[in-house]
């Protein structure tokens, strides 16, 4: 499943389809944008499958639930994936979150949650003013503090692993994100010793394997 059409999320699609005949699942707006970017016509209609927010889709033994997100894309979504009573949630590229977001992430066992930037690094950095405003807007990305606050609201007895994801290369770094989120957990919930594994997803490597 594809969350939205920005290049850092779809640049490998053509290769996956060409080499492995991979089906592509995304919302209608995202599929339209993908087709427009497919200049070589590699992706045929037979590879494209439309999904809709809040409507579950079965992919083999996995039930996939798309949920709408606030981001500057055509029709962006996050996903939850449920199989054998266990739930994994992917919530990145969120300009903001609300009760709707929290409701979709509740009772998750594994959570990939955006911790995109440190606000001070972003504001002092080299990005153009317009791009900074976009990132900080409700259609941009969650800061480290936002990520920690959202995590506080979705912690549950089932949660075993939380991965901080989609870190900016220019406006964040792993240890800063990790410490900022832990600080938020302490300030909002008084949590010092965590009952779940908190780690940072690496940019250029697969995340560690987890078994539920």
Give residue spans per PLM region.
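Short, basic/aromatic-enriched C-terminal tail that caps enzymatic domains
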Residues: 196-212
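Short active-site oxyanion
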Residues: 19-24, 87-88, 196-197
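Cap/insert and terminal regions of metallo-dependent hydrolase folds
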Residues: 99-200
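Active-site metal-binding loops of divalent metal-dependent hydrolases
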Residues: 5, 29, 69-72, 92-94, ...
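Metal-dependent catalytic neighborhoods of phosphoester/phosphodiester hydrolases
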Residues: 11-20, 35-38, 172-179
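Active-site metal-binding motif and surrounding structural segment of the metallo-beta-lactamase
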Residues: 1-29
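Core dinuclear metal-dependent hydrolase active-site scaffold
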Residues: 11, 50-110, 209-212
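Short acidic-hydrophobic, aromatic-tinged amphipathic segments that line or gate anion-handling sites
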Residues: 48-52, 200-201
């Amino acid at each position: 499943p594809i969350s939205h059409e920005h290049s850092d999320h779809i640049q490998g699609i053509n290769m996956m389809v060409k080499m492995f005949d991979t089906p592509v699942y995304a919302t209608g707006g995202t599929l339209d944008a993908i087709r427009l970017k497919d200049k070589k016509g590699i992706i045929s209609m037979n590879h494209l499958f439309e999904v809709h927010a809040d409507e579950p889709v079965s992919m083999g033994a996995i039930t996939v639930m798309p949920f709408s997100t606030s981001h500057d894309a055509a029709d962006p979504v996050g996903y939850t994936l449920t199989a054998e009573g266990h739930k994994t949630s992917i919530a990145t590229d969120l300009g903001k979150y609300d009760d709707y977001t929290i409701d979709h992430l509740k009772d998750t066992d594994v959570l990939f949650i955006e911790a995109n930037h440190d606000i001070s690094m972003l504001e002092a950095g080299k990005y153009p003013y317009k791009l900074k405003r976009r990132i900080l807007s409700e259609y941009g990305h969650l800061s480290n503090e936002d990520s920690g606050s959202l995590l506080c609201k979705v912690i549950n007895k089932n949660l075993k692993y939380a991965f901080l994801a989609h870190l900016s290369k220019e406006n964040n770094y792993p240890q800063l994100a990790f410490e900022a989120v832990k600080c938020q957990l302490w300030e909002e919930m008084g949590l010092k010793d965590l009952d779940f594994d908190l780690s940072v997803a690496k940019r250029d490597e697969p995340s560690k394997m987890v078994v539920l």
